[in-house]
């Protein structure tokens, strides 16, 4: 039966080699198929012209290459591209952000999120399930094929990956790590560890595991230097406080690919954007001796949120203070907000997740969505 077949899409190189050995075939055949899937975008075994007829027949009997369907894709006026992808009746979003000299793909790891950060629209959906490794890597496969100019063969339009979409990737460690392995494999997408960034709200034990098993670039959603406030807006802080988090970050910076940690800081008016917050942040990072870059993210309002985006003056003042104290600081530009693709808007209209697919089809005028 179809559901009993192994989906080769989500297998990293070692796993696909193990599968081929299990069906009595050679490792080099596995590498051929792996390259066809990810480098060339081919998912039909019969189109893999360097495979023998008997092998193709066996693969059709034992395996499949299943790509989730795209419910819709839409480009923003600023060039940002968004895909809504059907994953077993639910939907996740993937966003491509073009910039001069690079193209960044923001990838989701869960349907919804377990952490319920108070300012995050995705968390308001609740949590459905983890994505499989195939569903994670499918987002890159789809983007690479859509954006490619070489008739399906990956041409590195996507130069950077950020695991910053829907969900907390370290809460789906077992599926996210193999997917990132594929992203970095030279037979697939060939991205370096420096070009793949995982963003976490602070699942501290898994940060150590990530360093040992993957070593991609790390970004941490800090949002405040104050434990009391962080307990409120990032509830996982009650389990792993700022001291524990920064201890893990310090080790990661020493051994990771960038020798620093990027700290993400969502600025919310009169919540964490005061000069006193900036002073406390500087004191914290200097006292813990964590090499840091700081990425300030002006809050993107969504229906029902009590939080507000700070004025440009307040954002500038916060940034200037950090820079004056020696920290490389950037302000994330709002991109794709006309298609609900900006950071923090990945929950669309913040409605029940079970209706997301129907809502988006309705937006496109599909009468079958009702």
Swiss-Prot record:
PROSITE patterns linked to this entry: RADICAL_SAM (PS51918)
Superkingdom, taxonomy of origin: Bacteria
Chief place where the protein resides: cytoplasm
GO CC entries: cytoplasm
Subcellular location: Cytoplasm
Residues noted as binding S-adenosyl-L-methionine in the record, renumbered to the chain: 167-168, 199, 221-223, 300
Active site: 93 (proton acceptor), 343 (s-methylcysteine intermediate)
CDD domains with a match to the protein in the record: Radical_SAM
Co-factor binding details: Binds 1 [4Fe-4S] cluster. The cluster is coordinated with 3 cysteines and an exchangeable S-adenosyl-L-methionine.
Enzyme class: transferase
Gene Ontology MF, one: rRNA (adenine(2503)-C2-)-methyltransferase activity
Catalysed reactions, semicolon-separated: adenosine(2503) in 23S rRNA + 2 reduced [2Fe-2S]-[ferredoxin] + 2 S-adenosyl-L-methionine = 2-methyladenosine(2503) in 23S rRNA + 5'-deoxyadenosine + L-methionine + 2 oxidized [2Fe-2S]-[ferredoxin] + S-adenosyl-L-homocysteine; adenosine(37) in tRNA + 2 reduced [2Fe-2S]-[ferredoxin] + 2 S-adenosyl-L-methionine = 2-methyladenosine(37) in tRNA + 5'-deoxyadenosine + L-methionine + 2 oxidized [2Fe-2S]-[ferredoxin] + S-adenosyl-L-homocysteine
SUPFAM superfamilies given in the database record: Radical SAM enzymes (SSF102114)
Cross-referenced InterPro entries: Aldolase_TIM, Elp3/MiaA/NifB-like_rSAM, Methyltransferase_A, RlmN_N, RNA_MTrfase_RlmN, rRNA_lsu_MTrfase_RlmN/Cfr, rSAM
BP GO terms, sorted: rRNA base methylation; tRNA methylation
Disulfide linkage: 106-343
Annotated positions binding [4Fe-4S] cluster: 113, 117, 120
Function: Specifically methylates position 2 of adenine 2503 in 23S rRNA and position 2 of adenine 37 in tRNAs. m2A2503 modification seems to play a crucial role in the proofreading step occurring at the peptidyl transferase center and thus would serve to optimize ribosomal fidelity.
Family under the similarity heading: Belongs to the radical SAM superfamily. RlmN family.
Name the record gives this protein: Dual-specificity RNA methyltransferase RlmN
Name of the gene this protein is made from: rlmN
């Amino acid at each position: 039966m179809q559901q009993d077949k192994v989906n080769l899409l989500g297998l990293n190189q070692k796993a696909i080699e193990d599968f081929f050995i299990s069906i009595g075939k050679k490792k080099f055949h596995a590498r051929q198929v792996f390259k066809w899937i990810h480098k060339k975008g081919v998912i039909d075994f019969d189109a893999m012209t360097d495979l023998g007829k008997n092998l193709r027949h066996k693969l059709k009997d034992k395996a499949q290459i299943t790509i989730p369907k795209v419910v819709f894709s839409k480009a923003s006026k600023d060039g940002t591209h968004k895909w809504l992808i059907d994953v077993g009746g639910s939907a996740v979003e993937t966003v491509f952000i073009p910039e001069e000299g690079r193209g960044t793909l923001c990838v989701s790891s869960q349907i919804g999120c377990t952490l319920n950060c108070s300012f995050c629209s995705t968390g308001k959906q609740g949590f459905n399930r983890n994505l499989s490794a195939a569903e994670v890597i499918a987002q890159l496969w789809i983007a690479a094929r859509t954006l490619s100019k070489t008739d399906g063969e990956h041409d590195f339009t996507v130069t950077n990956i950020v695991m910053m979409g829907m969900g907390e990737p370290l809460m789906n460690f077992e599926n996210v790590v193999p997917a990132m392995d594929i992203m970095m494999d030279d037979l697939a997408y060939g991205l370096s560890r420096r070009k793949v960034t995982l963003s976490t709200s602070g699942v501290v034990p898994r940060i150590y595991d990530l360093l040992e098993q993957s070593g991609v670039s790390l970004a941490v959603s800090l949002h405040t230097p104050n434990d009391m406030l962080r307990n409120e807006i990032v509830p996982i802080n009650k389990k792993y406080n700022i001291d524990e988090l920064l201890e893990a970050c310090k080790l990661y910076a020493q051994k990771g690919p960038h020798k620093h940690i990027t700290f993400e800081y969502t600025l919310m008016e009169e919540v964490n954007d005061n000069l006193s917050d900036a002073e406390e942040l500087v004191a914290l990072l200097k006292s813990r001796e964590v090499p840091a870059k700081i990425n300030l993210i002006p809050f993107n309002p969504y229906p029902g949120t009590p939080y507000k985006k700070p004025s440009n003056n307040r954002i500038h003042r916060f940034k200037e203070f950090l820079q004056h104290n020696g920290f490389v600081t950037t302000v994330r530009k709002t991109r794709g907000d006309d298609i609900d693709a900006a950071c923090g808007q990945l929950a669309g209209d913040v409605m029940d997740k079970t209706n997301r697919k129907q809502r988006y089809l309705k937006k496109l005028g599909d009468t079958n969505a009702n």
